[in-house]
Amino acid sequence: MKQKILFIDRDGTLIHEPSNDCQVDAINKLEFKKYIISSLCQLMNFGYKFVMVTNQDGLGSKSFPRENFNIPHFFMLNIFRSEGIIFEDVLICPHFLDDNCDCRKPQTKLLKPWLKKNKIDKQRSYVIGDRETDMELAKNINLTGIQYKEKEFNWIDITKEIIKRNRYREVIRETKETYIHIKLWLDLEHHSCIQTGINFFDHMLEQLSIHSGISMYILAKGDLQIDDHHTIEDTGIVLGEALSQALNNKNGLSRYGFVLPMDESQAKCIIDLSNRPYLSFNAHFKHKMVGDMNTDMVEHFFYSLCCSMKITLHIDVKGKNDHHCIESLFKAFGRALRKAVKIEGNTLPTSKGIL
């Protein structure tokens, strides 16, 4: 399995860089950037590993003796370690810019051992630094760069951005009866494209996407010449799998979501990301079809989704119009899901230690 790596600059990003000489060569010059400890802990909980990459002009020279560098540097590493934050590697270029070496950022020599391993998840690994040279380094190793700016884009902002990009999944399921391809982004809104061949079902999934705040790409091809059963069932299975995988790390999750009556149809939905599949479905429809969708498949869709997502779901609706009832169910589920997947902290939302 490929590893998510954050290649992080030191001076100006992890710790303050002195403006007078740009050297952290004494304990009293060591100052951590705001929110750095809590942010790295949160990112670590999402499976990230850290590599420090730093240019230290003239390290080992008379103007910057290595022993002067080592004291605050190892003190810094020990503080990180005391909070459970471990750097897998510390890569240091000791040269001046005029030395024209091939290891000074944005050159890539220091990182070649990491790149040769071919075990980096390039879609979800980043270079983080405060300088343009850090962004150039990111480009040179084909990773996304995130520039730290203390007043405009600090560690809280960086952490939110990484987690937002991290909660993405793509799942494809192909059988003799259907082909289902789903991509979703839990923290990206209003970028959905849904095509199942069932117009009313498309409309319901669009409502789910809008009200959950989850962008969805859904392409479903099934044996609609027979009926809509396999297409709707397998869409529910794959959507549940994609949501479950995107929520693989549940640290900080709200976990629970609920909505009370909405619209004239009085839809209720209660959700628990419990890892225990269970569905309580209370709805009665007057007609066999709404548009081109069989109303019997509404419950079966939620059942398929519950089983593959491994959630506990209670949904209830009352109303006179089948269209409004079904639509309010999807809206209510979306609203409840929005609350349940929201990140509110750093800890696992259970006393069991596993979810």
Swiss-Prot record:
Domain of life of the source: Bacteria
Subcellular locations according to the entry: Cytoplasm
Residue sites binding Mg(2+) per the record: D9, D11, D130
Annotated Zn(2+) binding sites: C93, H95, C101, C103
HAMAP family: Bifunc_HisB, HisB
GO biological process: L-histidine biosynthetic process
Record keywords: Amino-acid biosynthesis, Cytoplasm, Histidine biosynthesis, Hydrolase, Lyase, Magnesium, Metal-binding, Multifunctional enzyme, Zinc
Record has Lyase as a keyword: yes
GO-annotated molecular function: histidinol-phosphatase activity; imidazoleglycerol-phosphate dehydratase activity; metal ion binding
The protein's name: Histidine biosynthesis bifunctional protein HisB
This protein's pathway: Amino-acid biosynthesis; L-histidine biosynthesis; L-histidine from 5-phospho-alpha-D-ribose 1-diphosphate: step 6/9; Amino-acid biosynthesis; L-histidine biosynthesis; L-histidine from 5-phospho-alpha-D-ribose 1-diphosphate: step 8/9
Catalytic activity: D-erythro-1-(imidazol-4-yl)glycerol 3-phosphate = 3-(imidazol-4-yl)-2-oxopropyl phosphate + H2O; L-histidinol phosphate + H2O = L-histidinol + phosphate
Region spans: Imidazoleglycerol-phosphate dehydratase: 167-355
Protein EC: 3.1.3.15, 4.2.1.19
Family (UniProt): In the N-terminal section; belongs to the histidinol-phosphatase family.
Needed co-factor(s): Mg(2+); Zn(2+)
Main location: cytoplasm
Location of the region described as Histidinol-phosphatase in the Swiss-Prot/TrEMBL record: 1-166
Naturally occurring in which organism (per UniProt): Buchnera aphidicola subsp. Schizaphis graminum (strain Sg)
